Amino acid sequence: MLKRSLLFLTVLLLLFSFSSITNEVSASSSFDKGKYKKGDDASYFEPTGPYLMVNVTGVDGKRNELLSPRYVEFPIKPGTTLTKEKIEYYVEWALDATAYKEFRVVELDPSAKIEVTYYDKNKKKEETKSFPITEKGFVVPDLSEHIKNPGFNLITKVVIEKK
């Protein structure tokens, strides 16, 4: 009876000692929300539906690079019109993400355009559509039958100046 009691106590002690180790490990590797600020990987969410990805380089009038902000994604809706004014507004937001209220957009590169690439189910091949940036703008097409989250990409140089 004594051997059985000692064996039971030994197993019980081992069980408790391992549970305290595993609790410490899980507590130390838990996610600490206080360490992350808005915009870090912890707060990134993939946009649902179409989005405009703005990836620009800010240059001065002589084409010298002033600012290279990170890219920013903005949700857009099919059927809405993206004019030059709206696109400049999005570009200014992208600039503000790096240097808040320091720069303003003077002009977009004349060759700037917005592109979207997707697999066309009807043609059974990859398609790339380009849309010029004009005052009149273009209507965002509904590509939901081909792709779930189409990314409309603006990758260009933008002439900027200090505010």
Curated annotation (Swiss-Prot):
It comes from the Viruses. Pfam families: Staphylokinase (PF02821). GO terms for cellular component: extracellular region. The keyword Phosphoprotein does not apply. It is found in: Secreted. Keywords: Plasminogen activation, Secreted, Signal. Residues 1-27 form the signal peptide. Belongs to the staphylokinase family. Potent plasminogen activator that converts plasminogen into plasmin. It forms a 1:1 complex with plasmin, which in turn activates other plasminogen molecules. This is Staphylokinase.
